[in-house]
Swiss-Prot record:
Name of this chain's protein: AP-2 complex subunit alpha
Mode of membrane association: Peripheral membrane protein
Function: Adaptins are components of the adaptor complexes which link clathrin to receptors in coated vesicles. Clathrin-associated protein complexes are believed to interact with the cytoplasmic tails of membrane proteins, leading to their selection and concentration. Alpha adaptin is a subunit of the plasma membrane adaptor.
Subcellular location: Cell membrane; Membrane, Coated pit
Pfam family, one: Adaptin_N
A Gene Ontology term for the protein's cellular component: cell cortex
Gene from which the chain derives: apl3
UniProt KW keywords: Cell membrane, Coated pit, Endocytosis, Membrane, Protein transport, Transport
This protein's record includes keyword Ribosomal protein: no
Family: Belongs to the adaptor complexes large subunit family.
Recorded superkingdom: Eukaryota
Assembly: Adaptor protein complex 2 (AP-2) is a heterotetramer composed of two large adaptins (alpha-type subunit apl3 and beta-type subunit apl1), a medium chain (mu-type subunit apm4) and a small adaptin (sigma-type subunit aps2).
Presence of the UniProt keyword Protein transport in the record: yes
Coiled coil regions in record: none
Amino acid sequence: MVASNNMKGLRAFISDLRSLEHDDEEKRVNVELAKIRAKFQSSTLSAYDRKKYVSKLLYIYMLGYPITFGHMEAAKLLSGTKYSEKLIGYLAVALLLNENHELMKLVINSIKKDLLSHDSLQNSLALHTIANIGGRELCETVYYDIYKLLMSASNENIVRQKSALALLHIYRKFPDLINPEWFEPIVMILGDDDLNVSLAVSNFVNLIVIREPKYQKFAYGKAVGKLKNIVFEHGYSSDYLYYSVPCPWLQVNLCRILLACERPSDNPTRATLIRVLDRILSLPNDNSNVQQVNAVNAILFEAIKLAFLVDESHSLYEKCMDRLADMIADKESNIRYLAFETTAYLISCGHSITSLKHYKELILSSLRYKDVSLRKKSLELLYMMCDEENAKLIVADLLQYLPHLDSVTQEDLISKVAIISETFATDYEWYVDVTIQLLRIAGKSADDGVWHQLVHVIVNNEEIQEYATKRLFSLLQSETIHECLVKAGGYVLGEFGHLITDYPDSQPVHQFSTIYRKLNVSSPSTRVLLLTTLIKLANLQPELNDRIAKVFQEYSTIINPEVQQRACEYLQLLKMPRDFLQLVCDEVPPFLDGNRDGVHPKSRPSSKVNLVDTYPQTIPNVSKPSTPIDVPEYDISACLPGFYRLCWKDKGILYQDSQIQIGVRSEYHNSEGAIYLYYENRQSNTLKSLSSTLIRTFSTFHLATTFQDTNLPSGVQLQQKYVMSGVNEIFEPPIIHVSYVTGVIRSIDLQLPVLLSKFMKPTIFDSYDFFNHWGQMGVEREAQLTFGLNSKDRKLDAKRLTKIVSGFHWGICQNVDSIALNIVGAGIIRFGTQNVGCLLRIEPNYEQNLIRLSIRSTNTSIANTLAKEMQEILRNSF
């Protein structure tokens, strides 16, 4: 708390409060608040008293008590003649007000007056307040004055430093206020002789080069020059040495600026930077001094990232690897965490870190650290290090560690191992073994999606059905097994139990007794599934019908309504004709890839037959299920083939039948677009009362022109036009309802091929620039999906895949990825008032017809939306 030494009342008040218990403290605070309120109402209140009482209010506020008065008195202190009054006034304004407070309008003039003052202390107080709570109105009033303070060489350096930070606040919140002509002069200040000013401006420059790429070349030269001045020319005084390390924060910021910039075209600048990085990577690190170690490592981490980007000759590769290896092996957990993070960053940028794979055991050992963040980061790094060569080894190691981990880390590990085993599986038996081991060791930490996917793979791959059924049945016979394995085993045994009846101890009677034992100790949801297993067993093994009927009879009186209902229904099924039971219990068909995430046995029918349609007799004493059936709001299924095709083509047929054909033509330019619909009568009779109604839309999508005549003669076309004036929100494709009369009223819902990607402007990067931007966006701004095609009969085709990606308005970047089959793209979407950069990486697996889609963007919501859109279109376009 800032207080003048002569405010004895304040000091006494603070001393009193510190000596009191909570209840007594609250009473004392309430007494003081009443006293202060009375004093503020006095007409003889002096400036000194106002300062003292506002200080008391601030202290009370900092203790956590609400302050509902005194704001005006605090604002009056800004007009005081003494520095101490202004100091308390600005502190009160910063703490008690926010940018939308009604009193902010009253303090704007005082702040502007102090900015124009020739007193550097008053300038500093005003700049502090702007940088902390500057709202739109305040920033509009003072932004030019702040710029003048920054650019004036006659001002004290402390004022210029604070001006840079205040201007950065304005640029972050209200970029439209900053004149683009100011950027180059601001970048120039990066080379200022005062390192504090350079440090303050460096944050601003970093944001400029990210938002305004055209200034990157200029900023690159300035940053390299300043870094060289510090490293080689000792352009600093002893005041800027932090434990013998020269201005480490500025060095870190300069490296980050260079990371954000494009690679320079002039070789001298690049050569200078490589020499500077070589010197930095050779810095000694005195392990006896923690502060020095932290400062040096902060610089090293940024220098290593930068070296990988600019050193095409790889002359610094060994030094980078040696320094990273030392930090990975460091005993200090913070250093090890940052080393893991840096290594993960390099991998995400496509760089090779082969030599660090020798430290796999060391990284694995971090999974047992007490620090949860280190455990999470080490697991993330191991996941990213996986490739076709080492996937099985890493999975085996992770499975060894799995039993010894806490539940949170187990859950994360299970998820990652499941993805690795599916992505890099060379044979499905290995995948089945790994997934079963995951569920056996840590089933309680596993998401249901893990065993759902196991069932999916088994059902869809005939060659492993016998092997998987035998493995799961063997586990079902053990006494202690987690319920997720019971569910998976029960499901698979019901479908494929007949495949293992020739094995010893796997005869139908053994299968029945095993399932019955598990029924008695399982949860209601598992019991429901196991009852389904028994009805399927009864279908294939008629000799067990009596035993199974007794089980159904037993569970038909159980208290749980869902289990009871299922038992009653299955008991009635056993009494029906044999051919009907066979029809109902037909083997489950292969799952479509589109449902791979939803293979829940309860939510999917085990037969292609509807019981009601097939056997209309009523079943006594069986109630209807209480769970409602979800009915889609719109039925757009008829237009989906055309919709999927037009999402990556500019024109074509959206829908047609024997009566009407509806075509589409799209035009997009930057952030605006138009979509034309063509209605054509395909029959000899006139279509009457043709209408088209927009039933789902978004804010900038609206009808521009439409047909006037609602009658459509044979062979005639009618046109309709919709326009899009930019995009400022995440949206779903619009849907129109089309109706017409041909003797009877006919109608159809059509989903229009308007996606977020349609507003993208294609961009081309070389390898350096792509992975530079890819790394800057980071894993946290990435949307990644792995999926297959919706039809098993379809095959991925490289040419068609590239054509579809290009049709999504991505700029295809050639010779960027080290794997030639991968597709890399870039684009920019004008979203509201911002240009949002987007990067794409597609890793197709043509043998298994799988696609791994990764999209990074400066806007995470846009990355997620683009990924979901592309997933749906790609899986339905082959």
